[in-house]
A protein has these predicted regions:
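Extended, charged alpha/beta regions that create polyanion-binding interfaces
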Residues: 1-25
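Glycine-rich beta-alpha loop segments
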Residues: 24-32, 36
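A structural signal for small-residue-enriched, beta-sheet-centric alpha/beta enzyme cores
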Residues: 80-81, 110-277
Length: 278
């Protein structure tokens, strides 16, 4: 599954680069955002550990007059892990802006861990966009935005949700509870409630009970919209300090797999010479 995902992701990234009219010889700066000392936030730095960087080789060859010895099937790539302001005392954007101004890459790829709004998305999806990224915004610690408008070069942001807050966990629990109730009532023709396990492959939406049933079991909370429920839960949990940010207990091994997946896909997409055999 990881290999299949890597192949699909690398192909989609190639298409994205083509869509942005980024040429094969365009220089790239890969930025790994996040705190390397906090596992679920270390996606960016971990990805950089396996990125093939070549900019220094081009610089050395240029000084020694040996550019003709460089394999043009390897793009000029550099990498940067700016850390977080709590460790460096410097705004992440300022570090990136300075490096971009000095090295002048043609485009940026920024990798970061995200906060999910649903438990089902944690470590299960890859987000890719050309609209930039605001570091820390998912956990209420918004920093200055990193995008094409502010830096003057195309910015492709890649993220994987690795954490989720208690509001989302509680919201999803209520939603799943309602679907369990709906399934039980449907199987018993509405005469008796008896819980049974829902298969992960089931279409859960089909089990969502009617508004009247939701109100019967949960009162006014049962008829609130998704956003209204989120807002209510946030108003209850946040002031009490209970809106914790959580991550799966298997995060160490999953981060190792996910970071390797992303770095391998980036290497294939950025360097035409690189291929992975099945």
């Amino acid at each position: 599954k990881l290999e299949e995902t890597r192949e699909v992701f690398s192909e989609e990234l190639k298409k994205f680069l083509s869509y942005k009219k980024i040429k094969e010889d365009a220089t790239c700066l890969v930025v790994g955002l996040g705190n390397e000392y906090i596992t679920p936030d270390a996606l960016g730095p971990m990805v950089l550990n396996n990125i093939i960087v070549t900019r220094h080789l081009y610089e050395m060859a240029n000084r020694q007059g040996g550019l003709d010895q460089i394999d043009v099937n390897y793009r000029k790539v550099s990498a940067l892990a700016p850390g977080v302001m709590g460790l460096t005392g410097i705004e992440t954007y300022d570090i990136i802006e300075s490096v971009v101004g000095k090295t002048k890459p043609d485009f940026l790829i920024v990798v970061d861990a995200l906060a999910a709004r649903a438990v089902s998305r944690v470590n299960k999806m890859i987000q890719m966009t050309d609209t930039g990224i605001s570091p820390g915004s998912g956990v209420g610690n918004k920093r200055r935005r990193i995008d094409e408008k502010s830096l003057g070069v195309p910015v492709i942001a890649i993220g994987i949700p690795t954490v989720v807050d208690a509001v989302s966990v509680t919201h999803d629990t209520i939603d799943l509870l309602m679907k369990h109730i709906g399934q039980s009532l449907a199987e018993k023709n509405g005469t008796q409630l008896e819980f049974s396990s829902l298969d992960k492959d089931d279409d859960l939406e089909q089990y969502l009970p009617t508004e009247a049933v939701r109100k019967e079991f949960l009162g006014k909370i049962g008829v609130l919209s998704k956003e209204e429920k989120r807002q209510l839960l946030a108003e209850v949990l946040t002031p009490a300090g209970y809106n914790l940010i959580v991550t799966p207990k298997t995060i160490d091994s999953e981060m190792a797999d996910l970071s390797r997946l992303v770095s391998n896909a980036l290497n294939v997409a950025l360097h035409p010479r690189i291929e992975f055999s099945a």
